[in-house]
Each structure stands twice: as structure tokens, then as C-alpha cells.
UniProtKB/Swiss-Prot annotation:
This is Protein NorD. It comes from the Bacteria. The lineage of its organism: Bacteria, Pseudomonadati, Pseudomonadota, Alphaproteobacteria, Hyphomicrobiales. Keywords: Virulence. It comes from Brucella suis biovar 1 (strain 1330). Part of the operon norEFCBQD encoding nitric oxide reductase. Essential virulence factor, probably involved in the detoxification of nitric oxide (NO) produced in the macrophages during the innate response against infection.
């Protein structure tokens, strides 16, 4: 009510309304297209354009652009952040929203063009020069060649690119620039006119070998994505201490593509003049494990971290007092290619080399420690167990009748008549004139592989993920016991490649009973999700079974990852390879997940029809038996 009395706040709000939103590109919010709404469609387009199936689509982060700003922008904030499209080996980074044109279809077409462009981008291009001028010119040359390649490979994109170039020409701002910057801008406009099939009267320009002092890069063109090369870093020797999940995970943030950089004190400014305000100087207290001086909300802290260009990360021991969710996509660690010596070792697939890393993962197999009390189920869950058992009893094999046997309880009349006719015709009769009945052979072996990584300690809809998994596992195990299928239950978690723990809840030759129920109740959240090694171990155990049909049913709540190099595309490619190896050995692989965002990577891992997404966690105990009946039938 009396906010107008705060002169500084009032003037600040008025100033922000006046010139706070003065971006280089115009924005048309009424015609905006959101990436989250069309990401699945764009993923299909990327695969259709020949892109690798394991490459993921993520929102690009708005980063500070160093191009020359107009007067109003310099007066407002002194910088401009742009969500420029980028690509690396594992990710397509697209703007979270495109509202560049006053036509929604054009904004959508820009997304499609970016996906087609990135599908043919040269991933082995040399790094751009350090000099700003030469970097601009090299980027324009790469863009020209890539546009030509995309239009030649996909002729249907050419009319779309023509319309986009004409629209970009109309929207690109005209700003006062230095002479050399004007020449680079003229080169950009010339390329856009060529794309739009417009006459171009620009003369060729000879550029110097280096840009002069004061040269600033050109304003990026949204049509031409950049290539991000991120070098691997040396493996860390220390162990990460996982942080237990709380009931509130906080708001979801976009994946932030980042670089690991070590600060070198020799590069610090050693000027004797203190020109900075003292509150901007980095204080030691910021890096010391002490109580924070204010009660800022974790949600606000997450939002503030999301807006930072530089975020200082450190390692600490012990459990922090508070945390927030922040998906930071750091470049992977270098792969340690040394061989491991252990009782059970499995290879790992390195997609970059196109070869296996032999004896790369050590699996520690052990039984689950039993708990004194079984899992306590409420009345609804107990009713579900009884209902599932009745449904699965129908699937129990009946007795099959064998005809023309040497011995049996009844005569096979057809065989008796046939034998008497043979004798009457002067032939030899047969003694196989009896009927025998026996139980039908149960020809299915199934392994339930359950992810018990740290993420299962999270709470969704006021229920812990692991508790719901236990309930679903207990319901399904009762059903499988009722139908008589041979079944084993394994859990897995990991902490680097030397410690992949696979525990046995139930073995194939073990009957379901109180002991197994106690083991299910004893399941606890572990660490990380090295899915490939666990799947290879489960496949090896299934391959030893004599049954003709084999099924590996994976229950997980997230995508594969570990604390070392096993993350991002490396983890996806290895897990996909492990699923392919299992199918090549005659093992059917099917995944069930409760991760609501898993639709982005599950098709790449298990293929079409190889997975099921249970969006509502509470429905997992009902959905899992239904999925099993479909697969077993």
C-alpha cells in the first residue's frame, strides 16, 4: 500500500518498465511455441533426419552474448542473454521458447529447421579460432556449408528455410556498428538473402587476419546453431557422498550445459587499486560449511542458481542442512580403461570408440539381508494381492493328455481301433493303446530386476518411491507364485564401476514364502544406477535356465547414471547395448518406469514396445501384474 514511499524501489520498477525489456530480437508472446509441448515430435523428426537415437533434446540456457548492444540495452542492464541453439555429442540444446515471429507456424518451422540442421552438423569440425573476427568468419563458413548439406539431404526443408530467412531479414535489428563489424553484418545479410532467394548486391570483402582492438562479435543468427566441444576431465579419486532425498524435490529446472574449469590464481587481477564495491568481493564464508545467515527459501535459491553464468561447486563431507534440485550437465570424466580383477566382471560399451571395454565393471552378487518383520500392507493392498492371485491362477498350466502310450490309466480308443484294423489287414498291431496325463510344462523363466538407487528414496504424491516398489513387487511375486512360473528377483545399485551390487531377493529354485517377503521388506535405497552391468549379470543368469522362453522385467525410476564417466549418452548407449545383447541371447527385455520424464530416453534404450510408463506412482501395484500377464501371455 505504501510501497510508493520507498523511492528507490519505485524508481527501479519504473526504470525496468521503461527500458528493462529491450532485447535485440523482437518477441511475440501470443505466437510463442514452447519446446516442452513439441519435444517428442522434434525427437521423432531428428531420428527421421538420421540423427542418433541416443541423442537427447534439452532446453538451452540463456547465456550472456558479447555482441555490441544498443544504447537502451546498455543503459538497462549492460548485457543481453540469448538462448542460442547448440549441439554436442549427447544433446541438442534448443531454445525453451521461440516467439521470434508474429506467426506461430514460422516459430514452429524454426524448431523443425534447427533439428534438421543439427542432424547433419559436422561433429568433427576443428575448434573455432580464439580471435573474435576469425571466429565469426569461421562460424559463418560452417553455417553456409551445413545449410547447403541440409537442403541437399532434405529438399523438403528448403522452402521452409527460404521463408525463415526472409522472416529473419525482416526482424534482424539494424544497429550502429564499427566499420569491420558492419562488414561482418553485411556478410550475414548476404547469406540470409541467398537463403531467401533475394537479390544480393554486396561486394566481396577482404577481412584482416585478426580483429582490431574493440571488435565485438556479431549478433548470433537463430537459424544457425553452434557446436559445443567439451573436453573430458581427469577422473576424480574421491568418493561422492549421496544426499538423501526429502519429500519435496522442488521445481523442475532445465538441464544446464556447463564446463568444468579450475580457477588459476595467477590469472587474477593484481591491480593495486580496489575499484570494486566491498560487498562484491568473494568472502571466505561463502565456501565454509556454516549456517546460512538468512532464511531464504530453497525454491528462491534454485531460481537464483539457474540465472548465474558462473556457479562455484565444491565438495563437502557429511549431510547438508538443505538442498535444491539443479540438473547440471557437466562434461564427462575421462574413461578409466584399466582392467578390473574380480569374481564377476562384465564389459562396458564405449560408443565413441565403437568397442567394448573388457573387464570394466565388477559385480558384487549377494543375498538380501532379511528383515524381522514382513512388509505391512493396508486393507486395499491385501485385497489387491488376493485379486491378483486369483487372476494369475487362471494362467497356471493344466494337465495335458498324452495319447498312444505304453502304459496309462485309460485306453486310447483311437489307438485301439487302429491297432485292431492293422491286425485284421495282416499287419502288425501296436502296444501303444493307453492314455496318460501329466502337468503341462512351464516353459517361462522371468527375472525381475529392481532399481534401488538413491532416487527411490524420493517422495511422490506423499509416498516414497521405494515403498511403492516394494508393494508392487510383493503383489507381482504372489501372482507369479500362483501361476507357477519360474522367477527370480534381483535388485541393483552402484557406486563407480568397481562396485556394482546385485542382491538376490529370490532365486529361481526358491519357493515364494515368508523368507522372500522379509527380504522385500528389507530393501533400502542405495546409490547410483549402472544399468548396463546389472542387465548383463541378470541376462547371464537367465541364459543358464533351461526354459525356452525367458523374460527380463526391469523396474526403474530414472535413467542410468553413476558418479564417474557413466552418465549422459555414454550411459544410454551402454544400457541400450546391454538390452540388445540380451535379446540376441533370446531374452525378452521390458522396462517399467515411474519417472514422468522418462519418455525422452526410454525409446532410445528399449525400442518401440519395449517399455511402459506408469505416470501415477500409486497405480504401480495394479499396473505391474497387468503388464506381466500381457508379456507372459
Amino acid at each position: 500500500m505504501l510501497d510508493f514511499l520507498e523511492l528507490e524501489e519505485t524508481v527501479g520498477r519504473a526504470w525496468h518498465r521503461l527500458i528493462g525489456k529491450t532485447g535485440s530480437w523482437p518477441q511475440y508472446p501470443d505466437h510463442a511455441v514452447q519446446l516442452v509441448d513439441i519435444r517428442q515430435r522434434l525427437a521423432i523428426c531428428f531420428r527421421g533426419f538420421g540423427g542418433d537415437i541416443a541423442v537427447q533434446i534439452a532446453p538451452a540456457r540463456a547465456r550472456t552474448s558479447t555482441h555490441r548492444l544498443g544504447l537502451r540495452r546498455r543503459m538497462a542492464l549492460g548485457e543481453e542473454k540469448l538462448a542460442q541453439p547448440l549441439r554436442d555429442e549427447a544433446t541438442l540444446m534448443l531454445p525453451p521458447e521461440i516467439a521470434l515471429f508474429p506467426d506461430r507456424q514460422l516459430n514452429y518451422d524454426l524448431y523443425v529447421w534447427l533439428v534438421g540442421y543439427m542432424a547433419v552438423m559436422p561433429m568433427d569440425a576443428d575448434a573455432l579460432p580464439e580471435d573474435a573476427l576469425r571466429r565469426d568468419l569461421a562460424a559463418l563458413q560452417i553455417a553456409e556449408q551445413t545449410v547447403e548439406r541440409a537442403c541437399r539431404a532434405f529438399p523438403g526443408l528448403k522452402p521452409r528455410y527460404k521463408r525463415l530467412c526472409a522472416a529473419i531479414l525482416a526482424e534482424r535489428p539494424k544497429r550502429p556498428l564499427h566499420r569491420l563489424e558492419q562488414q561482418v553484418e553485411a556478410r550475414i545479410l548476404s547469406l540470409l538473402k541467398q537463403g531467401a532467394d533475394l537479390p544480393d548486391d554486396a561486394l566481396p570483402t577482404i577481412f584482416p587476419h585478426r580483429g582490431p582492438a574493440g571488435y565485438l562479435p556479431a549478433l548470433p543468427v537463430p537459424l544457425w546453431p553452434g557446436l559445443m566441444k567439451r573436453e573430458e576431465v581427469a577422473p576424480r579419486t574421491g568418493e561422492d557422498e549421496p544426499v538423501r532425498n526429502s519429500q519435496s524435490e522442488g521445481a523442475e529446472t532445465g538441464r544446464q550445459i556447463a564446463q568444468r574449469e579450475r580457477q588459476d590464481p595467477r590469472h587474477a587481477d593484481r591491480s593495486p587499486f580496489i575499484l570494486n564495491r566491498f560487498e562484491k568481493i568473494l568472502a571466505m564464508a561463502e565456501m565454509v560449511s556454516v549456517d546460512r545467515p538468512s532464511d531464504d527459501s530453497d525454491e528462491q535459491n534454485a531460481k537464483s542458481a539457474d540465472e548465474l553464468d558462473d556457479l562455484t561447486l565444491g565438495e563437502r563431507k557429511g549431510r547438508p542442512a538443505a538442498r535444491f534440485r539443479f540438473d547440471l550437465d557437466l562434461p564427462p570424466e575421462a574413461v578409466d580403461r584399466s582392467l578390473l580383477t574380480a569374481e564377476l566382471t562384465y564389459p562396458e560399451w564405449d560408443y565413441r570408440k565403437g568397442a567394448y571395454l573388457p573387464d570394466h565393471c565388477a559385480v558384487l552378487a549377494a543375498p538380501v539381508q532379511e528383515k524381522e518383520k514382513p512388509l505391512e500392507l493396508d486393507a486395499a493392498a491385501q485385497s489387491l494381492v488376493r485379486r491378483v492371485r486369483r487372476q494369475f491362477e487362471i494362467l497356471r498350466p493344466g494337465r495335458e493328455v498324452l495319447r498312444a502310450q505304453l502304459d496309462g490309466t485309460d485306453l486310447d480308443l483311437d489307438a485301439v481301433v487302429r491297432s485292431r484294423c492293422d491286425l485284421a489287414a495282416g499287419g502288425q498291431g501296436s502296444d501303444r493303446v493307453h492314455l496318460m496325463s501329466r502337468p503341462q510344462a512351464n516353459d517361462l523363466a522371468v527375472t525381475l530386476l529392481v532399481d534401488v538407487s538413491l532416487s527411490t528414496d524420493a517422495w511422490v504424491d506423499n509416498r516414497r518411491v521405494l515403498d511403492v516398489e516394494k508393494e508392487a513387487l510383493l503383489v507381482l511375486a504372489n501372482g507369479i507364485a500362483a501361476c507357477g512360473d519360474r522367477c527370480s528377483i534381483l535388485t541393483f545399485t552402484s557406486r563407480r564401476r568397481s562396485w556394482v551390487r546385485v542382491e538376490t531377493v529370490k532365486d529361481f529354485d526358491e519357493s515364494f514364502g515368508p523368507t522372500v517377503e522379509h527380504r522385500i521388506a528389507a530393501l533400502k535405497p542405495g546409490f547410483y544406477t549402472r544399468m548396463g552391468a546389472a542387465m548383463r549379470h541378470a541376462t547371464a543368469k537367465l541364459a543358464e535356465q533351461p526354459n525356452r522362453k525367458k523374460l527380463l522385467l526391469l523396474l526403474t525410476d530414472g535413467k542410468p547414471n553413476d558418479v564417474d564417466h557413466y552418465e549422459g549418452r555414454f550411459a544410454l548407449e551402454d544400457s541400450r547395448r546391454a538390452a540388445g545383447e540380451a535379446r540376441a541371447k533370446g531374452v525378452n527385455v521390458f522396462a517399467v518406469t515411474v519417472d514422468r520424464e522418462a519418455s525422452a530416453h526410454l525409446p532410445a534404450l528399449f525400442g518401440r514396445g519395449g517399455y511402459a510408463l506408469v505416470a501415477n506412482l500409486a497405480k504401480l501395484p495394479v499396473a505391474l501384474p497387468a503388464i506381466y500377464r500381457m508379456l507372459a501371455g
